[in-house]
Regions:
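Proteins enriched for Cys/Gly/acidic motifs involved in redox and nucleic-acid/cofactor modification
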Residues: 1-184
C-alpha cells in the first residue's frame, strides 16, 4: 500500500492547497489513491484533467481516483459520471479533515460538493513546505466578488475572503524557518 499521490493542475493556490489535501488524506489513512486537484479556468484545463484521470486509471487500475478543485466544484456531475472516478470532493470540503476520513466508509458519500458561495472562511492551515518545490506559495486571499461574464473563478472559489494578516505572517515565518527564501509576490 502506498500513500496518496496528489496531481496538481492550475494555479499557485492549488499548489498550496494540494499540501493540505496530502496531509488530510495521509492522516485519514487513505492508501492507493490518486487525488486530482483540478483547474477550471479554461475548457482546455478541464479537458486535460479528464485526460489525466483516464491515463492514470489505465496505469494504476487498482487505485482510487478522487477529483477535487475548481473543475470538480463547477461541474461535479461530469466527473462523477466518469467510470474511473471513485469520489468527487468540492473546493471547501477538500480543506477539511473530516471528508477525507469519511470518504470510503461503507455509508460514505461519493460526491461531497456544497455551495461554495456560502463559504466565509479561508483555509486556515499552515504548511511546512511544498513537496518537490524549491519555492513555496502562501494563501492570502481566495475567491472573487466580481462576476465578469467571461470568468468562472467565483463559481469555483466562491466569494472573496482574506486570510488574517497574522496568519499570513506566521505562515511566512514557518516557511522561512524551513529553508524557503522570501521572493517577490505574484498577484
Amino acid at each position: 500500500m502506498s500513500k496518496p499521490d496528489v496531481v496538481t493542475c492550475g494555479c499557485r493556490l492549488n499548489s498550496f492547497e494540494s499540501e493540505i489535501i496530502r496531509e488530510n488524506a495521509e492522516s485519514a489513512g487513505l492508501e492507493d489513491a490518486v487525488i486530482f486537484n483540478t483547474c477550471a479556468v479554461t475548457a482546455e484545463a478541464t479537458r486535460q484533467a479528464r485526460q489525466a484521470i483516464r491515463r492514470i486509471a489505465r496505469e494504476r487500475p487498482d487505485a482510487k481516483l478522487i477529483v477535487t478543485g475548481c473543475a470538480a466544484q463547477v461541474d461535479p456531475d461530469r466527473f462523477q459520471e466518469m467510470a474511473e472516478v471513485s469520489a468527487v470532493i468540492g473546493n471547501h470540503e477538500k480543506m477539511k479533515p473530516a471528508p477525507w476520513q469519511e470518504l470510503f466508509a461503507p455509508d460514505g458519500e461519493r460526491v461531497l460538493v456544497n455551495d461554495i458561495m456560502s463559504v466565509e472562511e479561508t483555509a486556515g492551515h499552515m504548511i511546512e513546505g511544498l513537496e518537490g518545490r524549491t519555492r513555496a506559495f502562501i494563501q492570502v486571499q481566495n475567491g472573487c466578488d466580481h462576476r465578469c461574464t467571461f470568468c468562472i473563478i467565483p463559481y469555483g472559489r466562491g466569494n472573496s475572503r482574506r486570510v488574517p494578516m497574522g496568519e499570513v505572517v506566521d505562515q511566512v515565518k514557518l516557511l522561512v524557518n524551513n529553508g524557503y527564501q522570501i521572493g517577490r509576490a505574484h498577484v
